[in-house]
Amino acid sequence: MRIRAVAGWALVTTLCVFAGACNRNGIDPNLPAITVQPVNTTAAAGSTATFTVTATGQAPLAYQWFAFAQPIKGATSSSYTTKTLAPSDNNSFYFVLVTNSLGSIESNEVLLTVTTTTTSTASANTLGNANPADVLTQHNDAGRTGLHSGETLLTPSNLNVTKFGKLGTLITDGEVDTQPLYASGVTLPSGGIRNVLYAASEHGSVYAFDATSGAVIWQSGLLGANEQPTDSGTCTSTPQERGITATPVIDRTRGPHGAIYVIANTKDSAGTVIQRVHALDIATGSELFSGPMLIQASANAGNSVNSSASQNFDAARYQPLAGLQLVNGKVFAAFGPNCGAAADSSWIMSFDAASLGPAGSLYLAPAAGPNAPGFTAAGLSADSAGDLYIFGQATYASHAPGSANVLVPASAGNAFLKFSTQNGLALTDYSKTSTSGPASVINSGTQTSSGALVVPDFTDDAGRVWHLALGAGGDGSISVLNRDVLGASGLQPTPILQVIWGQTAQSGVTGTMAYFGSTAFSAISGDPIKAFALNDARLSTAPVSQSANTLGASGAQISVSANASTGGVLWAVESTGPGILRAYDATDLSHAVYDTTQAANSRDAFASAVSAVPPTVAGGRVYVATKGGIAVFGQLK
């Protein structure tokens, strides 16, 4: 039993000893006391659940029930019956505060489990044991759609500057360049059950915060003895420390409580850069599977640029940027050039999720010219079949140990690449953006791309099921592809399904698009946020809605929250200048419902946002990565 002060309530201690009114335990019987605690409850979606408490103490006793530490309006009796439950109410937490004129006492926190026979089709998530309330990977699911469809508390109708705002900041020991992750209903060694927010810093630390109270549950530093994070060298656009840059991934089926997989960069006292893959217990932060494991790889890399040369992975030359992916029992990571070093090549590697041992590697080099395979912070995308996808501006050759070279022509431009993960790693198909755009744009080689968005199965008006992928290029294009037939046949790419030109700015893109309700969203620097409708496997050639504001030089990182198919909110974080969090009605982007500049006296201002991390929305709160921690937003009391 916990006794603690709760905001808005006073906790009073009575010294009954001096009054001769104590019971045999030395406790004043007039103080409120709980004799029968509420218990964990399981109920089906579409029904209700009831929690009950029995308390003693001097009358009158007052009751106030809480959900996720927020008081429930009208829930002021010894029992509380929920509203009709939805699947997204699964793993909700409740407690009751009992008060009289002498003091207050909290009940144990109890868990509501909601069962359902329905299957979500909102994403192509291949993570094991994923709960609708969870956010276990970069951009919310394996397909990188950016959709969190288990949000019941935040809707366009209740988001405004009066009711919603900044709640506080979770402090970390370095810049946070990874997306915060969220696991609901984590059982802790103490026996408590908590919703937990995970954050990783560039100083090489992983944090588990109580998502309700903000308390640190555990912190694990991944620096070895006499080690420090690596640095950014001469780069001015990257953090001075480089410890953990790629968003981790969580598998709730691994280990005693679940595992969070992390890649950390360190540098020893001699200046040698070391990269390791870790698996940490999500409840304790302890290393799992005899980890960590040193990252090493080699490949045969004979091609027109680097003829007959053997390639060994050099941790000092390659940086893990893309969010980690979990497919077919393997953790996948992509390594791009570190601050311009080795700018002609990159790597994809996989690690066994049960042992952390190497499970395959692929070295990617340009077939011709200087362009390197482009990885942004957007994670490697995956579909339900376990295939991986990359969308980036580059020219490629692919090499795996013992395999024949597969060369992609030098005109690849914005290339979609498909990789099989069934037996190691293999490039199996690809396509490239149409060259019908302006020649100066196609040949510039200076733009970045969004990463690939894997669209959930889409049925057209004729009943045909399409397996689509989307990508926005920094050259001002948006592409729609059929993942089943990208077009590589005899090394001659064929046109993709659709390329839209002129509807997005020709500028850098650092994050994926987002997708909700047959609508794709783009948020490119120098452009409004735009929505494009998907019909008959084609996007509308003009936006169906767009924001009134134009984005700055860094564009915006976007996510969508919804309660299944309703209540969609598009969230955007801008990092140009002071950080700004914005919220829009996802069905009409011209309807902006909130932003952090609206409140007086800088009430909702937060430390500078980082440039490539989308916001995480879970449990009625929004978490934004910053240069000093995680800014937390939610309903104000």
Set out the residue ranges of the language-model regions:
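A short beta-strand segment in extracellular, disulfide-stabilized domains
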Residues: 47-55
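Hydrophobic beta-strand segments within extracellular beta-sandwich modules
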Residues: 63, 94-95
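Solvent-exposed loop segments of extracellular immunoglobulin-like
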Residues: 57-64
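Mobile, glycine-rich extracellular loop/lid and propeptide segments
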Residues: 125-460, 464-489, 509-532, 555-562, ...
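Surface-exposed, flexible coil segments in extracellular/virion-facing regions
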Residues: 66-84
